[in-house]
Structure formats: structure tokens, C-alpha cells
Amino acid sequence: MQRNNFTEVIEFVFLGFSSFGKHQITLFVVFLTIYILTLAGNIIIVTITHIDHHLHTPMYFFLSMLASSETVYTLVIVPRMLSSLIFYNLPISLAGCATQMFFFVTLATNNCFLLTAMGYDRYVAICNPLRYTIIMSKGMCALLVCGSLGTGLVMAVLHVPAMFHLPFCGTVVEHFFCDIYPVMKLSCVDTTVNEIINYGVSSFVILVPIGLIFISYVLIVSSILKIVSTEGQKKAFATCASHLTVVIVHYGCASIAYLKPKSESSVEKDLLLSVTYTIITPLLNPVVYSLRNKEVKDALCRAVGRNTS
């Protein structure tokens, strides 16, 4: 592709929440508060699952991996977004934008497949309890985690170099971070191939995990309904409730954001959706798993009691 006919763009500026005018300071305070709570919550989960031997199980291993991934995920996006709310027209270099997008795609994909691994873990625990420790061995858990991260890296390698091989004419990104579509819109040339790659990657990353999780929960519900005691059914449902809550919010927002027709896109709606899956969902994980999960709450109490004694 020839670049000689285009002025070389070396940096971008985020439009972000500039349309909110005077409310940007309020947004800064709100987002900063959520960011601090998200980091604190996820770090607490990682720490608790590491130090409390009662939580040394596959379920909490996956939870700690998800919390770690969500921590880095927010570090990649939120600090830059907060800076843009305070310092207007703060530029980001082309290399910086590519780096942010690479980590975003990698970690977003990793999170999707980690949630799938957690769904599989719940399926094995409920449908094959006698073989649970054999199936969900340390090797299998490591394989699922590495597979999730590896898939994320492959998706990023497919996506990001193809995106930044394009020549850009515009410099104003109608977003608060280097997301795929807003950056693609700045290209001077036809982006049909890139759009096909993006839609293919998005469909794979969203629909494959949704399908696998759906199958897992169909089998889980089928097994739960066979449990004779009502108490046993309640306990089984309770173990899945936290995961299912996070899955619905996570994939619901991601599906609307990346699989909707281009004709239905608008800057305001896209910003709102992006806030949900980049800021709200990472906070949802520690809140849901700590408030709804008795084992995590007990582990927190033990840790607090140990430190105060």
C-alpha cells in the first residue's frame, strides 16, 4: 500500500467526553472513584485467593487470574482516560495508540475465554463431582489459562498490525481510548478488509465463548434439576449465580458494542457501552464475587482477624 500521497499522522487526540462540557470534572471524580475501587477489589481477590488455603481450588484460581487480567486491563485504559478529562487535547503517539489497542484486544479476549473456563469448571464441579479433582488438575487449569492468554495474543497479532498498516488522515479519535472502530474511521483508504477482520475476530471472541458457556449451563441446569433435595439445588445454583451475573453483563455489552450493524452506531451510545465494559464490568467482578460468595467473605474475615490479632 502506498503512503506517499498521504500526510503522515504521528499522533492522535481523543475526543472523549468533551461534549459533556462542565460535567467532565464530575465524570473525572466518578471514574477515579470506580477505578480505585476496581483496583482495590481485584487486588484483594488476588491476595486472598493466594494466602488463604481454603481458596486453593480451580474455581478461585480462575477467579484470581480473571482479577489479575482485569487489573491490567483497567490500567491500560482508565489512567489515559482520566488524563484526557483533565488535560484537553492531550495527544497520544501512533506507537502508544497501537500499544494500547494491542493490550486491549489481548486482555479483552483473555477475559472472555477465562469466563468460559470458569463456566467449564462449574460444569465439571456439578455434573462430574466425583471426577472433579482428576479433570480439573493443575495441568488442566494452567492449560486453560495459557490457552485464554494465547488466544488473546493471536487475536491482537491478527488485528493490530493490519489496523496500523493503514494510512490515516484524521487525528481526532471519537472515543476515550484507542478502540478499533474509532481508529479505523480515521483511515484515508477503504477499510473493508479491516472491517471483515474486525467482525470475524469479534464474532469469534464473543460468540464462541457464549456458545460454550450456554452449553455448560444447559448441562448444569439439567443436572441441578435431578438433585432431589431443595437445599442441594439452592447450593448448586448459588455456586453459579456470581459467574452467570458477570457473564450476562460482560457479553451483553460486548455483543451490542461489537456485533451491532454500523448503521446503528452513534458516538454517545458507543461511549456509554465502552464505559460499561471498560470501567463498570471490572468493578462488577470483585463486588459480585465478594458479596455473593460466602467462601470469599469468610476468607476476608479470616484475613482481617489474623491481622488484628
UniProtKB/Swiss-Prot annotation:
Origin superkingdom: Eukaryota
GO cellular component, one term: plasma membrane
Record topology, Cytoplasmic segments: 49-57, 106-131, 225-235, 292-309
Keyword Ion transport included in the entry's annotation: no
Gene Ontology molecular function terms on file: G protein-coupled receptor activity; olfactory receptor activity
CDD domains, A to Z: 7tmA_OR10A-like
Side of membrane Extracellular, spans: 1-27, 79-84, 153-203, 257-270
Location relative to the cell: Cell membrane
Keyword tags: Angiogenesis, Cell membrane, Chemotaxis, Disulfide bond, G-protein coupled receptor, Membrane, Myogenesis, Olfaction, Receptor, Sensory transduction, Transducer, Transmembrane, Transmembrane helix
Annotated S-S bridges: C97-C178
UniProt KW Cell membrane keyword: yes
Transmembrane segments: 28-48, 58-78, 85-105, 132-152, 204-224, 236-256, 271-291
Record's bilayer topology term: Multi-pass membrane protein
Any one GO biological process: regulation of angiogenesis
UniProt note on tissues of expression: Expressed in the olfactory epithelium as well as in the testis. Expressed in round spermatids during stages VI-VIII of spermatogenesis.
Role of this protein: Olfactory receptor. Activated by the synthetic floral odorant, lyral, and by alpha-cedrene, a sesquiterpene constituent of cedarwood oil. Its activation increases intracellular Ca(2+). Acts as a key regulator of myogenesis through its actions on cell migration and adhesion by activating the Ca(2+)-dependent AKT signal transduction pathway. Also acts as a regulator of angiogenesis. Moreover, plays a role in the regulation of lipid accumulation in hepatocytes via the cAMP-PKA pathway. Involved in sperm chemotaxis and motility.
Family: Belongs to the G-protein coupled receptor 1 family.
PANTHER family given in the database record: OLFACTORY RECEPTOR
Protein name: Olfactory receptor 10J5
The organism of origin for this protein: Mus musculus (Mouse)
